[in-house]
Amino acid sequence: MWGNSVRMRLSKRAFSEKQEKSIAKELGGKVTPNSGGLRTVSSWKGDINTDTEKLECKITNSSKYTLKFSDLSKIRSYALKYNRDPVFLFEFASGEYKDKYVCLFESNSCEPLTQKSLLFSSADLFKRQKLNTLVYQFKYTDKGVDRGISVYTYRHYLTIRNNQ
């Protein structure tokens, strides 16, 4: 009765919901119900809301993840509208280099990238985190304005967050 694509979508949704619930619990936030599937009011956009942050969470079983700059722009827009800090989290959920990473909007001196996305490899990010707590830094252009992004491990993000 159910096709493979329906089962796959349901399992992806359950996979994402499990990630969101776990992170929301750890951060003391609330999960946005069916955030990717409904046209919710903008105050609930984003996967997780805390008192000070609005988070968008992505998860993959692949060893590669494509970060779309449009996703960064959306979470920034939703967060700032409600006076919250935008946080974009992506997770490599399987494989030798599984880990979570957080993108924060921070100034930097990088030249703006011209592409619309960035491909991350779990192995590359894992190696980079051994060298520095700041795993990656870049700039992209959003509606004519350059936005600096810093990528940290989720563990380091928790340290930053708890020291504020």
Regions found by a protein language model. Give the residues of each.
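Catalytic phosphate/metal-binding cores of nucleic-acid and nucleotide-processing enzymes, i.e., regions
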Residues: M1-Q164
